[in-house]
């Protein structure tokens, strides 16, 4: 993801619909992994963005839950007067040691019991969020990892 290499193609996107499609694609994998996903979704939430990047962003987020999550995850898509917020929280397999480095390129804490990680997942997510003009926040709350994307309307 070289600087300026991806130029977004902006159009009117139903964020809720694209998110729902991605959830259907990941449903079986999440179920097989024993991860119960709770979803809170504002319907017909439209936003001027790149539909392909939005889709790839969601795929990376859900893939991250599959690799590093366990038992429970919650996905929220909501808006207020000024912003649209996507929040994905999941219980982690291993405690997170260096939250501030998680989105660094090639950094991995090997938080997964089963899989080697390239350390690119959150780095890619951060880059997509920046390309789309949004803000990415990462946090931990007890056993939970919380990823929040804020897009300005």
Where are the language model's segments positioned?
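Conserved micro-motifs of the catalytic ATP-binding
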Residues: 3-8, 46-49
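Short beta-strand/loop element within the Bergerat-fold HATPase_c
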Residues: 72-82
